[in-house]
Amino acid sequence: MAATNNVDPMHQFTVEPLHGLHIGKYDISFTNSALWMVIAMAALAIFMAGGRRKALIPGRWQMAVEVMTRFVNDMVSTNIGPKGRPFTPLIFTLFMFILFANLLGLVPLFGFLPGAEPFTSTSHVTVTATLAAIAFGTVLVVGFTRHGLGFFKLFVPHGTPMALIWLIPGIEAFSFILRPFSLALRLFVAMTAGHVLLEVLANFIVNPPVQSASPAFLAGYYTLVGIPTFLLMIGISALEFLVCAIQAYVFALLTSLYLNDAINLH
């Protein structure tokens, strides 16, 4: 008989209200997603506050903050140049928030926060779309503020043959419009896929294929299937930590490249 208590791989993405609040017809309840975004922002604030102390001999915390700030600063300098310095705080905040939000979803709390199981807020397209809108909105504001209608020159690459002048701007404009969608969907899909895979593998360990089985069958099952699956989960979990960092980096990198287009028109 098939097991009836299978793990639902999509349950982890369910947004649940922790504190109900309604204003008229609008539901503005404080949810688990909002909680973990607040925790991510608090973790970022604590991380930065710990690095503000300029000790003569920096400790590990201060060194970690300096490494991260230098990393983002080098990214901005390489991709935008000196004109990109004013946007370093924005790119740093996006990078660190996404990094913390991604990583917090992988932290096993084991009931330390009752009713607040780990939740990856970046696994919801509404969150990633908001982050993408912030990045893309900044690009538009910077582009039109600095260049006015000359910003549309971005859609006519230098050296475009006259024979293609009717075609290239349309392709470039379409590619430009797709940028926020690709930013949002890339992060959303990457975070969702990895977590679903971990839940599916966990189901093989928690639920044997036969609900009522002999001890001998269960021993053989966990030896041949359970242990290898558990080891595979450890490897995939380690890979997920790497994916969390890579996705935060890619989001920040693309934001800096898009800002470069808006600032330098190339």
Swiss-Prot record:
Protein's name according to its UniProt entry: ATP synthase subunit a
Predominant cellular place of this UniProt entry's protein: membrane
Entry similarity comment: Belongs to the ATPase A chain family.
Keywords (A to Z) from UniProt: ATP synthesis, Cell inner membrane, Cell membrane, CF(0), Hydrogen ion transport, Ion transport, Membrane, Transmembrane, Transmembrane helix, Transport
Compartments where located: Cell inner membrane
GO molecular function, one term: proton-transporting ATP synthase activity, rotational mechanism
TM regions (residue ranges): 28-48, 90-110, 125-145, 158-178, 187-207, 216-236, 239-259
Assembly mode: F-type ATPases have 2 components, CF(1) - the catalytic core - and CF(0) - the membrane proton channel. CF(1) has five subunits: alpha(3), beta(3), gamma(1), delta(1), epsilon(1). CF(0) has three main subunits: a(1), b(2) and c(9-12). The alpha and beta chains form an alternating ring which encloses part of the gamma chain. CF(1) is attached to CF(0) by a central stalk formed by the gamma and epsilon chains, while a peripheral stalk is formed by the delta and b chains.
HAMAP family per UniProt: ATP_synth_a_bact (MF_01393)
A Gene Ontology term for the protein's cellular component: plasma membrane
Species name: Zymomonas mobilis subsp. mobilis (strain ATCC 31821 / ZM4 / CP4)
CDD domains with a match to the protein in the record: ATP-synt_Fo_a_6
Protein task: Key component of the proton channel; it plays a direct role in the translocation of protons across the membrane.
PANTHER family from the UniProt entry: ATP SYNTHASE SUBUNIT A
Membrane topology of the entry: Multi-pass membrane protein
Record flagged with keyword Methyltransferase: no
